[in-house]
Amino acid sequence: MNRLLIKNCVPAIIALTLTGLYSVIDGLFIGNAQGDNGLAAINIAWPVTALITAAGTGIGTGGSILYASFCGKKKKKAADSVLLQTQLLFLITGIALLLVLGICKDGLLSLFGAKGIIFTLAEQYTKVILLGSLFQVVGAGVIPLLRSIGMSVSAMVVTIIGMIINMTEIGRAHV
């Protein structure tokens, strides 16, 4: 197998596997602390998390494609401009999602079926998620950018750091 392929794919596979474990870790901590109602609440709120992550991943993937394209054409100035614009878009999107979802969260949670104690817990969980929305957009988006500039190991490290922070914050907040 091609050494370059392994160098880039193995860290990406590890990072994607760890990203998939975020929900499992949330479920373990919250399930132990809040029981079935807590698990129901994070499942109700999950589309909010998915939307924030998708926004970051989409921006980062688009930026990484443009960056790689300009680098391939030896247009360094344009490539650098794409990186700057992508970072600005992360910032704008993270703040916009915080504001819009913050305003709409109660309606969304009701639309998703939350009632009673599940609504209350889902609202609390969503507030925490929204407070970190800017970091989540940047965190999800920087991964494809790092991969496109040949830093797939750094992308994996960013994912691992995010997972450790996630475990630490959830552990402190819910145990």
Per-region residue spans from a language model:
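Residue-level signal for short hydrophobic patches within transmembrane helices
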Residues: 2-21, 25, 48-55, 131, ...
